[in-house]
Amino acid sequence: MTMTDPIADMLTRLRNANQAYHDQTSMPHSKIKAGIAGILKSEGYIADYKVNEPKEGEVGKTLTLTLKYGENRERSIAGVRRISKPGLRVYAKSTALPKVLGGLGIAIISTSQGLLTDKQAHEKSVGGEVLAYVW
């Protein structure tokens, strides 16, 4: 069965693993998921991510995210929300990029220059599709 929204599936797996205090979570790999994982790592929301080659008998690559917690198991991700969906795409101009929780969170934007955070897109003056909010 095909997946309608692979990005929403990734964010749901991340949210569920975070709520259950899991150390890692795995999902099918794609370039855009790896790009989102790279942004989450650079912004300090996850500890690491790794692309695993398919094992014998498996079909495709997998992406493994290593979650990050504080000293007393405080979650580094308070919330994740998918914004642009297959049924309702959400775009923002460079002048109208969203601020998540007054700048405490990030918005992940798909632009012509690749995946960027809202701050990076504002600095480069590019708009694009608002994929998700993370705070």
UniProtKB/Swiss-Prot annotation:
Record carries keyword Transmembrane: no
GO molecular function terms attached to this record: rRNA binding; structural constituent of ribosome
GO CC annotations, alphabetized: ribonucleoprotein complex; ribosome
SUPFAM superfamilies: Ribosomal protein S8
GO biological process terms, semicolon-separated: translation
Keywords per UniProt: Ribonucleoprotein, Ribosomal protein, RNA-binding, rRNA-binding
Listed Pfam families: Ribosomal_S8 (PF00410)
Entry function: One of the primary rRNA binding proteins, it binds directly to 16S rRNA central domain where it helps coordinate assembly of the platform of the 30S subunit.
Family (UniProt): Belongs to the universal ribosomal protein uS8 family.
Subunit relationships: Part of the 30S ribosomal subunit. Contacts proteins S5 and S12.
Protein name: Small ribosomal subunit protein uS8
Organism: Cutibacterium acnes (strain DSM 16379 / KPA171202)
Gene coding for it: rpsH
